[in-house]
Amino acid sequence: HMGDENLEFSEPKRLAKILDKFPDLTVIAAHLGGYSAWDDSVKYLVGRNVYFDTSSSLMFIDKEKSMKIIKTHGVEKILFGSDYPMWSHKDELQRFLKLGLTNEENELILGKNASRLLGTY
């Protein structure tokens, strides 16, 4: 989990230190890697062995910033997340589709990346 109200324990900088100690560790960082600390997710986590999910992010972040994170980190390291039961799957999917990614990018984020990560694709 990343970027909670108590940022001290879920800040991107802290996760980066863990990744420095365990470079082969693969991590999924919720909320595009930072929730309320998206600039730090770009600064400390982009390009690392981290997958970001989209849960509880797209309603709170503007399209330009979310696209910057997705494109800079790489669509192959982004996972769709709804944060159900907090938000409905349908609403989160609609928010995601409004980003305007290509069909190929959508397929990766909506399932193929997770399948590859979990070893089923």
For each predicted feature, which ranges?
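C-terminal active-site rim and adjoining tail of enzyme catalytic domains
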Residues: 81-84
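Catalytic pocket-lining loop regions of alpha/beta-barrel enzymes
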Residues: 1-79
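Mid-to-C-terminal alpha-helical segments outside catalytic/metal-binding sites
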Residues: 72-79, 89-121
